[in-house]
Amino acid sequence: MVVKFTKSEALHKEALEHIVGGVNSPSRSFKAVGGGAPVAMERGKGAYFWDVDGNKYIDYLAAYGPIITGHAHPHITKAITTAAENGVLYGTPTALEVKFAKMLKEAMPALDKVRFVNSGTEAVMTTIRVARAYTGRTKIMKFAGCYHGHSDLVLVAAGSGPSTLGTPDSAGVPQSIAQEVITVPFNNVETLKEALDKWGHEVAAILVEPIVGNFGIVEPKPGFLEKVNELVHEAGALVIYDEVITAFRFMYGGAQDLLGVTPDLTALGKVIGGGLPIGAYGGKKEIMEQVAPLGPAYQAGTMAGNPASMASGIACLEVLQQEGLYEKLDELGAMLEKGILEQAAKHNIDITLNRLKGALTVYFTTNTIEDYDAAQDTDGEMFGKFFKLMLQEGVNLAPSKYEAWFLTTEHTKEDIEYTIEAVGRAFAALADSK
């Protein structure tokens, strides 16, 4: 049976007339998987999507991570509805924002103080400003391939070597801004040390995805994050954890709790909103007191702390406090990993699979993936074919070889079993096309 996307194709054609590129985020485009009209979804419930053509999918996109409790979770939708009935925006303090801030602090002890914003991009952008205000320095460091939103300072690629300054990774980012950014490879202590030896006295902070989620799921090598803290603090700079993807995804207390390493500042987003727009940042009291109205680092937002997002976030965290929830995600993730690897061996398809608990990435390569260079050197064309074969099987993935598969609390063993069978059929088709 061939799945038809007639209405999605027509809708995309219309969208191209009104929306830039036909999408509101480039990651939704099918450009990276061979082109064509992206599938337009009409509704989601639990672990499933239905598109505008009526096709049903098991969803592993999970909105790029936030939908850990599945689509339209009743506890969360009830909280959002109640908040909406009471007014979606006040422009004043509320009891909800205080309650939610306390919940975040209890979950992540590194957060002495918290401030809400509207997105992960805003959260990261502001932690950089706060770090600069606190240290009096201007440069930042980041790891190659790690995505920290779309503000100018983080859209910077590596220069010609670890001891050179960055180059713009997007049109519209001035070279003068790129000169404030040093990019080094993830999981490589020596290049980090080399860069800090040269530039450390000018560095305000380093941005760290403690578990990488933006060139697939890549864990830090044992001792790497501890060494990052040591070297960066020796240079007088701060450590910022970008936990926009990782917080509440792998463990209730985030990657910093799972790995036992504490940053100075933390940026949050995605999961904490329960599906609504949100961001937050926090950290040590003496650093956060740089933020207005207490300090000179200005940050504000009309929509920040809005009642709907606060209510949704509180409800989401209440669901995530259920006993055994993360163990279930890990169990299902292990089952899916085992099945995919068995199907790859059966059909002689070369893959490397990285998994941590309820998230995984399938790379079409035989190489170990520990940094961005290795992730780049994988077969994107093969992934594009696999992606479209899986759509035909009723399995929805992110349209990029760099993205993760995210499990939700609503996936079942039957969903995993079907997915493994679908992977087998897709791998068989790929093997036949070689």
Swiss-Prot record:
It catalyses: (S)-4-amino-5-oxopentanoate = 5-aminolevulinate. Its main location: cytoplasm. It is found in: Cytoplasm. One of its GO terms (biological process) is protoporphyrinogen IX biosynthetic process. One of its GO terms (molecular function) is pyridoxal phosphate binding. It comes from the Bacteria. Keywords: Cytoplasm, Isomerase, Porphyrin biosynthesis, Pyridoxal phosphate. Pathway: Porphyrin-containing compound metabolism; protoporphyrin-IX biosynthesis; 5-aminolevulinate from L-glutamyl-tRNA(Glu): step 2/2. Its EC number is 5.4.3.8. The modification N6-(pyridoxal phosphate)lysine is found at residue 270. CDD domains: OAT_like. GO terms for cellular component: cytoplasm. Its cofactor is pyridoxal 5'-phosphate. Homodimer. Belongs to the class-III pyridoxal-phosphate-dependent aminotransferase family. HemL subfamily. This is Glutamate-1-semialdehyde 2,1-aminomutase 2. It comes from Bacillus cereus (strain G9842). The lineage of its organism: Bacteria, Bacillati, Bacillota, Bacilli, Bacillales. The gene is hemL2.
